[in-house]
C-alpha cells in the first residue's frame, strides 16, 4: 500500500498548491493489532496505545493520536509513511518471512482555519490466514486478523441490506473506520492477487471479499 499512499499524498499536495484556499494536510497512522490501537507516528514512543471513544452522533474518535503536519512537501510525507511501516508489527507466519500481523489505517486529514475539511483513510488489511497453511504459527494474531475481517464483512453486508443496525462496534477496526463507512461515503477496495496455484484459496477469498465491498 505504501507506494499507492505516496502517490495519493503527492496528488493531494499538488491540488492544495493549485487550489490556494488555505487547506493544509495532516497525517496519522494507526495500527490495529490484536484489538489494540497503536499510534505508529507517536513522538512519545514507538507504538503508543490509543483509546477509542464514541462522540457526538455516535461517531467514533481516537483520543491522543499524534496528527503530524502540516505536510509541506512529498518528501516529509514519505518519511512519515516509512516510519509507520517500520513500526508496524510484522513476523514470520510460516508462509511469508515479513507477514503483516496487523491492519494499518493511514489517515490523511485536510484542514483549514474553520476546522476539518475532509478526511481520507487508506487501509492496508492483513490477509486472512488458514491455519492448515501456516501450521498454527502466531495463531493468536491470525485469529484476531480473521475476526476483524469478518466484522468488516458484516458491516458491508449490513450496508448492502440497508439494515437499521450496522455492527460497527463488533471490532476495533470497524469502529475506527465508521466515520468513512457510513452511507453516502465513498469506499474503494484494491486487491492484491497471487497468480500462483498454491495461493488459489486465498486469492478466491480475497476476490469474494472485494465483491462484497463493491456491492456495498
Feature roles, as predicted:
Residues 1-185, 192-195:
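P-loop NTPase "switch/coupling" elements that transmit nucleotide state to mechanical/effector output
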Residues 155-159, 206-213:
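Conserved AAA+ ATPase "sensor/coupling" helix adjacent to the nucleotide-binding pocket
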